[in-house]
Amino acid sequence: MAIERTFSMIKPDATKRNLTGAITKIFEDNGLRVIASKRVWMSKREAEGFYAVHKERPFFGELVDGMTSGPTVVQVLEGEGAILKNREIMGATNPANAAEGTIRKIHALSIGENSVHGSDAPETAAVEIAYWFSETEIVG
């Protein structure tokens, strides 16, 4: 498999419970390197822009409110097959359906407070990484 980069976000429900280190350790223990990371408090405008693809969905307002409720850690992860590997490590969006040992099974509170976000494809990874990081902030 090729070395890839993917975008990862540790959401406010997890940062409020001081889980940043525990979640990052899971990524690293599974062969992903953190090559960029910063802690941000999303503005409403940033959250609406980042999640614009969901704008017409009924949960959009609740999503924006949740993402602006506390600090978020945005990261770029790198490794072999990083996009798929990250998705496997995170587990299903709904923690009730997540496999044992995944981040969401271990740490998520609900489908709305599911602790992490990760890119689903190379194209979305590129867009999401560029949304939060300049090239000089990514140090591989």
Curated annotation (Swiss-Prot):
GO terms classed as biological process: CTP biosynthetic process; GTP biosynthetic process; UTP biosynthetic process
Amino-acid positions noted as binding ATP in the UniProt annotation, renumbered to this chain: K11, F59, R87, T93, R104, N114
Pfam families reported in the protein's UniProt record: NDK
Keyword field: ATP-binding, Cytoplasm, Kinase, Magnesium, Metal-binding, Nucleotide metabolism, Nucleotide-binding, Phosphoprotein, Transferase
Active site: H117 (pros-phosphohistidine intermediate)
Broad class of enzyme this protein falls into: transferase
Localization (cell): Cytoplasm
Cellular component GO terms held in the UniProt record: cytoplasm
Keyword Cytoplasm attributed: yes
Protein's UniProt keywords contain Kinase: yes
InterPro entries, A to Z: NDK-like_dom, NDK-like_dom_sf, Nucleoside_diP_kinase, Nucleoside_diP_kinase_AS
EC number: 2.7.4.6
Disulfide bridge positions per record: none
A single GO molecular function term of this UniProt record: ATP binding
Cofactors: Mg(2+)
SUPFAM superfamilies, per the entry: Nucleoside diphosphate kinase, NDK (SSF54919)
Catalyzed reactions per annotation: a 2'-deoxyribonucleoside 5'-diphosphate + ATP = a 2'-deoxyribonucleoside 5'-triphosphate + ADP; a ribonucleoside 5'-diphosphate + ATP = a ribonucleoside 5'-triphosphate + ADP
Family: Belongs to the NDK family.
HAMAP family xrefs: NDP_kinase
Function: Major role in the synthesis of nucleoside triphosphates other than ATP. The ATP gamma phosphate is transferred to the NDP beta phosphate via a ping-pong mechanism, using a phosphorylated active-site intermediate.
Complex and partners: Homotetramer.
Name of the protein described by the UniProt record: Nucleoside diphosphate kinase
